[in-house]
Amino acid sequence: MSYPQAPSKFVNPDEIIPLSPPTKPPFAQYAASPLPATPHTPYSPPSPSRLSETIPLRPYLSLLPRILLTFFSPCLLPMILTIAHLIQNRSSTASLATSLKSSVLSACSGLAKAAASIKTLPRYLAMQTNQEAIRATQASILAIGTMLMDAITIIEAVVNFIVDTYRSLLLCTIELAVRGTLEILISAVQTISDAVTDTLNSVRSNIQDDIGDANDIIQTAVSAINRVTTLVNLNISVPEFSIPALSFLQNVTIPTTFEDGLITLNSSLPTLTDLKKKMDEIIDTPFEALISEINSTRLEMAASFNSSILSVPSLSSLSANSANDLSNDLCSDLDTSLIDDTAKALHKLSSIAIGLMFLLLFLIWAALAVWEWRKWKLMKDTVDAVNEEWDRDGKSDAWRMVAIVEHPVLERYSGTFLGKIAKMPRTRTNLRWFLSYLAHPTCLALLFISLFGFLSIQFQLVALNALKAHAQSSANSTVTASTNSLVTKLNAAALNSSQEYADSYNEAIAGYQDRINNELFGSWVNTTAVTLNSTLVEFYDEVEKALNASFGGTILYNPINTFMYCILGSKITNLEKGLTWISEHAFVDLPTFPSDILLLSNDSMNEIATPIAAAAVGSGDGGDDDDGVVGTLISHFESALKVERTFYGIMLGVWLALFLIGLAVVIWNSGGREKFMALRGVPSSSSPPGYGPPESKHPRWKAWLTNNHPIYDSYAEKQFRGTTPTNCLESYTHADVPNVNNGNDDHEKSFFKMRDSHAAGPFGSHATSAVRSTIASLAAPGQSFLKLSGRKLTDTTTPYDDKVPLAPVQTSEKYSRDHANSPFPRPSSESSESSAAQPFWVDKFYGAFEGVKSFFPTRSQRLGAALARKASQRTEGSFGASQVPTARTPGHDWIGGHQCLPEKKAEPEWSMVDPRMLGRALEDDKGRYPRVLPPSEMAAANYNPHPVYPRPMSRASTLGEGMVIPSTTSHPDPFQDMPPLPPKHKRASMDYVEEYESSHSRSSREDSRHGGVTSPASSSVSYFAAEPQLVSASKVQVGVAQKGGQATRALAEIVKELQEKRERKDPFGDDYERGL
């Protein structure tokens, strides 16, 4: 069977120093010799003086150029551009303030020119006012005359009605009183006469009837008496009274002289028809004359009131002040301080913003310089770690190297964070991709440009809003004072003309007012009131004469006279009082003009001065150009800031879109794809490579990582756990040399392609070494990503996958490593990782839960603490042969275990030492490899027991057994590269969780608990920190070379010596003790 050769390295013969050959695999880390160590001359690299006097340039940037380039970092460029914009806005604001002040003064000058025109306004206003006043006055005179004529006509009708009413009332009253009285008297006289006659006749009849009745009564009584007396025969007779005639009472009457007088008076009463005609003539004559006089007077007065009697201001008064003088008067003390104050406030705001931006620029630059220094340091440590790994292990994943070098800070600090929030390796890998995506220079530049720019502009806008409110309030008060002053000056310019015009107009109106009072109301009062009064007096006199003629000398004269005064006389008296009041109040007052008739009102003047106020603070009507000079000044500054804010906001939105795209990709690859496929009914085989179940045709476990690993020691850990062999070892006549994975597969997720979870443990280093600590911390994410499983996260095979058989063997693990193709199950948590991924937030929850659990001691830590408390310091004797990490044969690892093993030829063994001890003289006389003695000889040699590391519940890598190392006859030259063996330890794998940190701290605690001396096969980071007193050798099989190849002479002697040791009895076994 042929073995592929590793690519040969070019070795310059001039650089080879005798006795110090370059390190060659596989003997760089493995050596075996029974002889004492041979002193070596330390190999020293050429001193810098041999190379060159000057340090040449490298194909990469060192620290100083990187710090120099931070001045133009994408984080600083937006701030520099923002500062430039602020400086430009500040200069443009100052120039705009000067321009706006000029515009306000120009507006005031224009108003002054308009005010000069306003001074000419009173003449033209007076002319127009005169025309309207003449028209109104003429109409008023005519209307007053017409009103007076109508009033007089109405009064005439009313007087006639009143006079006729009282005349008719008087006549009717006389008819009612006199004729009624007379009729009553005549009727009474006749009734009395008839009553007297009837009464006397009735008396006569009654007397006669009474005498007749008396006679009858007497006769009746006598008759009754006689009937009684007839008994005695006695009759009484009484004589009757005679009835008188009484004829003188029958024709008695009253004399008719009085009655005849009353009848004559009733027929002789007057009708007052002549009085009515006379009164109508007396009333109508004066009223008709008054109406005619008023009509002629009103027409003459209306015609005489024209424009000739009203004056107007002359144009000569305008030459006193020119327009320029008026402009100086109006605009000389115009307050424009509000513009200056606003400009100064904006300038101060810009200066403060620029200063803060410069300060922030310096702070960010300092932070970037520190960041670049830290990044450079981490990058150097990473490069050193990668070089060391590559020198020891060969090439690995170059793309992983790119990720580490691009983002060394993320590699250093993201492991703990991602390990706490994500439980599954796939989720951690996706989140690591997301962080790299966000940390890309383009994405970072976009974020910093948009964020810094947006925040700086927004802070300025907030300060500008407060400044705008203060400027507006100050501008309003200033403009109000300026407007009041301007209105006062404009009114003072037109006050004289208005006063002259008002005086001339009022004089003309006063003359016509006198004419109206004297000619219209005077004639009416003098004529109508006096005439009417005399008419009423004459009317009353005529009525009294008629009553005197009719009732004079009678008993009715006084009642009738009193009644007439009550009915008519009192009314005439009240009418005379009314006429007297009219005479006293019959005049008119025509309205006159005030002295400011030609001046504009305050509202009008404010309206004229509004343009200046609008130019200063805006009109306030909500238009586009109503902000005024102050608003324009602030709006100019604000608009520039808003344009920049919009630009930065768009850039921030683009970054958010990129953020969401990256987040969607992470969610899709963290379980979203599986859910989508499940919803569509797609089989699970459509899962991404490396995350689905293992396929049988491509084994996922490397054969050389299992039972036939050349460095695989499961002895001590099996004995500590108390397990027994589950199967018998089989003899293998050959073993393949493990290959070096060059990492060409694009689907590989790990930086170092670990073929075994034991080999993926963190490599020990000195605790005081910052470089080694950094290397280990950078390598920790890869270790955690593989979860110490040793699986390759891809289904593609390497050139050796199909050539190396899989065989179940005993290991230090509790379960078989052949999970894919072995009948032995592996019910560990790692097998669940190949199932369908949990959702991202579920993983995040479990990750947080695991992070909390990490603060508490683990089970292994508690057990170790219990061992430290309850047991003394363990030695080789206390642990027994099964706990001593010494060289053992497979057949003697277990008591009785060799009975189930097939017989096979004993094979030699050889020791593995630390490669760092090469070329170092050992202090012990026993040499590099002390011989293992029986207990009796150890006691005789003053052997002191020493503490060893029992590795409780350890998951660290151990040395396997059972794989044959073939001899390589194809490389007779010892200086030529040999096919490499897999290293005993893998240094700090690169992944993103805290497994390395926890294992590092746990190993440190265990080392301190056990004295600091551990097995070289353990994962303790402090192994090389102390010189062990006993170097235990792990067993490997050094078999016969394949295809008849011959090993070197030195190798043959080593094999022979190891074979002799193998044939010895176990000095720590029961058989050996019985033999003693």
From Swiss-Prot:
Top-level taxonomic group: Eukaryota
Give me the stretches of Basic and acidic residues compositional bias: 997-1010
Q: Which GO terms describe its biological process?
A: plasma membrane fusion involved in cytogamy
Which of this chain's residues carry glycans? 235, 251, 266, 295, 306, 476, 496, 526, 533, 548, 602
As for membrane topology, the entry says: Multi-pass membrane protein
In this chain, the stretch annotated as Disordered covers 1-31, 796-834, 874-899, 963-1020, 1057-1076
Which locations, inside or outside the cell, does it occupy? Cell membrane
Pull one GO CC term from this UniProt entry. plasma membrane
Its main subcellular localisation, reduced to a broad class, is: membrane
Q: Could you tell me the keywords of this UniProt record?
A: Cell membrane, Conjugation, Glycoprotein, Membrane, Transmembrane, Transmembrane helix
The record places the following residue ranges in the Extracellular compartment, namely: 1-66, 160-350, 456-646
**Which residues does the entry place in the Cytoplasmic compartment?**
88-138, 372-432, 668-1076
Q: Where are the transmembrane segments?
A: 67-87, 139-159, 351-371, 433-455, 647-667
In what ranges is there compositional bias, type Polar residues? 874-886
InterPro entries given for it? Answer: PRM1
Q: Of which family is this protein a member?
A: Belongs to the PRM1 family.
Question: Main role?
Answer: Involved in cell fusion during mating by stabilizing the plasma membrane fusion event.
Q: What is this protein called?
A: Plasma membrane fusion protein PRM1
- Origin organism is Cryptococcus neoformans var. neoformans serotype D (strain JEC21 / ATCC MYA-565) (Filobasidiella neoformans)
